[in-house]
């Protein structure tokens, strides 16, 4: 299970009298508004005065009306908006000392010594320099009679915390920057749309994506849309790339592919550090292959639109932690300025100086054409993505004679449980990598019930073309388990199909199937083959993993609907919505969508509540709407106490809110499973497939004799991966049983429960918040 460091509890009004300012600088990024909102509301919750600095560093230099005190209501209704409410600008004045001198004067005059800077590497580098010069700036201001000596003494220390807001994801020290996930959404939305017209005309499309000198967006987008080729700065192609590119496109066309997609990062270069542009690639393809080729430059579309659920939650978490980091620094002068970063799934504080220095080293390595070192400096998350892409880019459809050889070992793949977006990405990646390794991949249709009926067939290379972007399960899925169907029948089919390994994709039912198959090995030797499982369920209730495939897509679907529901209340005003989400007994979807959607409450099984709690929330909403807030939003997970249904909550709110607000109820239902997978689910599914086939191949090769002779042997059985940035780790299924609540189909420990107080605080409730961040080094990325 995930291990979390304990932080400090923070109560309302704990830091009364402190002043905090927040600014957004440089290029805007979706999710900045979520961070600004969290800084303001957590600051006010802690008793601080919070100030907006409008127009970034330019507003800090100009002062005056650009520095304004913020209220709770000032950040209401901005969570779902792209860009930044307080404006951003690239400020040349701040690059010079005279500009920083004016900025220091304006901060002192407003009695501000705590600053949250939200921006990219340039903005945070400027913040680092500003803090380093603070003492000398104050001395100069005293000498020129701009401030008094008493003021200089009173405000002698400047505390700065950075939040990385950048779609490029190019800042060292954090796995994800605010805005990168939303930018991926825009890229994939555009690519999916382009693919349909490209298919009609058999065209090749070359897409230029942003990212400056970082290839993250192009790299992940290429995996998420089955691109034929990608050009990124960190991995310049070999000198013969023209021949290889043309060969790959030619082969794909010969095998029936009607569409070719090529991703080009705007900073793409060759081994001689010369730019590779879309025009160069287009001219090559047209001259050598005579393909109808078009260029699409996505441009600032990637910065726009509503933030993804991930960026809203990330911005909220980082903004809240930034306030607490500032308060800690104010009480301990030895603490360095830090950046609130994401390490795997945990917020950490990384020294700002080290982050800036490491980011500078990346630029130097790229300039020196030391690409391997640049990739290493980018961090483990980037390296894992790159390794997966390289593995997939090297494979091509084998000759038919190799694919049809009778000597090929057979690996089965089956789906169990409800459909979830991302499943098809696993099947595609697993199938093609398996075929390349010499296996026959046997697709078992309609779960284990299909297996018992003999509904299984070999999956061919071309069968899975285009599957990464498809929702649901193309193989079909059922909830039946081996014991329910008769494990003797399942074992007989294993023997009949001559399976040497098995991959199960699914949710809690798949987890139960794995355990039943392990327990059946003692009686049925046919089950003694390596098996692995990929967690895939929107409920995110599989023990041993932080994220299951499909839950990110579901979160985005729910968040999008919540935005529309809240929008409807703007016209009617004074309305509270009760919304029921899926998830079974697991409250993940209800809690995280409440945080991403700005809900006032979320009722879940894991956190018991009573009628009195409901009444308190009604009182809270009455006061909120009396205070000129137009709407309220309450979420409920679908499996709670039987008597407290969504309709009961709706009637209670409607009755208690009479004269103040009216109430409506919405049950979202199966639309939460989504249409097309999110970029996260597509890329995660592809990486899961790569890890699964590698492990199964290793186990099969290590035990090849025993498998062929059907010797009774219990191989080590792994269940799934705890998804971190540093690696994808396997877990033993039987070890996980003690961490499982089988009655309610839940893990006994759930990491996201620690975020519930933050959700309540953002909605103006009293709640005891626990800081989740710890101090860490840049080597975590």
From Swiss-Prot:
It is found in: Cytoplasm. It catalyses: beta-D-fructose 6-phosphate + ATP = beta-D-fructose 1,6-bisphosphate + ADP + H(+). It is an enzyme of class 2 (transferase). Its cofactor is Mg(2+). Residues 410-781 are annotated as: C-terminal regulatory PFK domain 2. Residues 1-394 are annotated as: N-terminal catalytic PFK domain 1. PROSITE patterns: PHOSPHOFRUCTOKINASE. Its EC number is 2.7.1.11. ATP binds at residues 27, 90-91, 120-123. Optimum pH is 7.5-9.0. InterPro entries: 6-Pfructokinase_euk, ATP_PFK, Phosphofructokinase_CS, Phosphofructokinase_dom, PKF_sf. Signal peptide: none annotated. Beta-D-fructose 2,6-bisphosphate binds at residues 479, 537-541, 575, 582-584, 638, 664, 670-673, 745. SUPFAM superfamilies: Phosphofructokinase. Residues 395-409 are annotated as: Interdomain linker. The active site is at residue 168. Keywords: Allosteric enzyme, ATP-binding, Cytoplasm, Glycolysis, Kinase, Magnesium, Metal-binding, Nucleotide-binding, Transferase. Belongs to the phosphofructokinase type A (PFKA) family. ATP-dependent PFK group I subfamily. Eukaryotic two domain clade 'E' sub-subfamily. Homotetramer. Catalyzes the phosphorylation of D-fructose 6-phosphate to fructose 1,6-bisphosphate by ATP, the first committing step of glycolysis. This is ATP-dependent 6-phosphofructokinase. The gene is PFK.
């Amino acid at each position: 299970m995930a291990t979390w460091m304990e932080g400090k509890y923070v109560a309302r009004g704990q830091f009364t009298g402190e002043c905090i300012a927040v600014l957004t600088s440089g290029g805007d990024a979706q999710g900045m508004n979520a961070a600004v909102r969290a800084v303001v509301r957590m600051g006010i919750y802690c008793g601080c005065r919070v100030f907006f600095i409008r127009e970034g560093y330019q507003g800090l230099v100009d002062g005056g009306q650009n520095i304004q005190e913020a209220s709770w209501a000032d950040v209401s209704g901005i969570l779902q908006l792209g860009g930044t409410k307080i404006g951003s600008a690239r400020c040349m004045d701040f690059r010079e000392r005279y500009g920083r001198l004016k900025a220091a004067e304006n901060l002192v005059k407003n009695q501000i010594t705590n600053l949250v800077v939200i921006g990219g590497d340039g903005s945070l580098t400027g913040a680092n320099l500003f803090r380093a010069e603070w003492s000398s700036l104050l001395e100069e201001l005293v000498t020129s009679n701009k401030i008094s000596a008493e003021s200089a003494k009173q405000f002698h220390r400047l505390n700065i915390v950075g939040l990385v807001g950048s779609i490029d994801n190019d800042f060292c020290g954090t796995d994800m920057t605010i805005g990168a996930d939303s930018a991926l959404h825009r890229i994939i939305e555009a690519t999916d749309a382009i693919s349909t017209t490209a298919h009609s005309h058999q065209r090749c499309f070359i897409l230029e994506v942003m990212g400056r000198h970082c290839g993250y967006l192009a790299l992940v987008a290429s995996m998420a849309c089955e691109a034929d080729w990608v050009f990124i700065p960190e991995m310049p192609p070999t000198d013969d790339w023209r021949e290889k590119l043309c060969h790959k496109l030619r082969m794909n066309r010969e095998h029936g592919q009607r569409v070719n997609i090529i991703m080009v990062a705007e900073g793409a270069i060759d081994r001689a550090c010369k730019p590779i542009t879309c025009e160069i690639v287009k001219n090559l393809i047209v001259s050598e292959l005579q393909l109808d080729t078009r260029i699409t430059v996505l441009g600032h579309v990637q910065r726009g639109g509503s933030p993804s659920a991930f960026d809203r939650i990330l911005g909220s978490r980082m903004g809240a932690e930034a306030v607490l980091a500032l308060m800690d620094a104010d009480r301990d002068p030895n603490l360095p300025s830090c950046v609130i970063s994401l390490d795997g799934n945990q917020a950490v504080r990384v020294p700002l100086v080290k982050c800036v220095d490491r980011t500078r080293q990346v630029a130097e390595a790229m300039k020196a054409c030391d690409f391997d070192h640049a990739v290493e400096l980018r961090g483990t998350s980037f390296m894992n993505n790159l390794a997966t892409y390289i593995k997939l880019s090297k494979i091509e459809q084998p000759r038919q004679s190799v694919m049809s050889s009778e000597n090929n070992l057979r690996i089965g793949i089956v789906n169990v449980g409800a459909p979830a977006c991302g499943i098809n990405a696993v099947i595609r990646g697993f199938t093609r990598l398996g075929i390349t390794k010499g296996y026959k991949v046997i697709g078992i249709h309609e779960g284990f019930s299909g297996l018992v009926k003999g509904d299984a067939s070999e999956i061919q290379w071309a069968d899975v073309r285009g599957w990464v972007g498809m929702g649901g399960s193309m193989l079909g899925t059922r909830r039946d388990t081996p014991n329910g169907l008769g494990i003797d029948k399942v074992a007989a089919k294993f023997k009949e199909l001559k399976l040497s390994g098995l991959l199960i994709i699914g949710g809690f039912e798949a987890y139960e199937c794995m355990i039943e198959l392990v327990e059946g090995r003692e009686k049925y030797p046919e089950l003694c083959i390596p098996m692995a499982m990929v967690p895939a369920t929107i409920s995110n209730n599989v023990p041993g993993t932080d994220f299951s495939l499909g839950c990110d897509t579901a979160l985005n679907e729910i968040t999008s609907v919540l935005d529309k529901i809240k929008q409807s209340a703007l016209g009617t005003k004074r309305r509270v919505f009760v919304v029921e989400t899926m998830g079974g007994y697991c409250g993940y979807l209800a809690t995280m969508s409440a945080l991403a959607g700005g809900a006032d409450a979320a009722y879940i099984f894991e956190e018991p509540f009573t009628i009195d709690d409901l009444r308190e929330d009604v009182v809270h909403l009455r006061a909120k709407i009396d205070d000129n807030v137009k709407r309220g939003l309450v979420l409920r997970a679908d499996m709670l106490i039987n008597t407290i249904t969504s309709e009961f909550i709706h009637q209670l709110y409607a009755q208690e809110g009479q004269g103040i607000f009216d109430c409506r109820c919405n049950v979202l239902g199966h639309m939460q499973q989504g249409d097309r997978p999110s970029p996260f689910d597509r890329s995660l599914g592809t990486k899961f497939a790569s890890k699964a086939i590698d492990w199964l191949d290793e186990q099969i090769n290590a035990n090849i004799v025993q498998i062929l002779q059907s010797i009774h042997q219990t191989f080590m059985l792994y269940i799934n991966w705890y998804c971190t940035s540093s690696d994808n780790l396997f877990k033993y299924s039987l070890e996980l049983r003690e961490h499982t609540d089988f009655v309610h189909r839940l893990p006994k420990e759930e990491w996201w429960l620690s975020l519930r107080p933050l959700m309540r605080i953002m909605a103006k409730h009293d709640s005891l918040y626990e800081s989740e961040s710890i101090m860490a080094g840049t080597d975590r990325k």
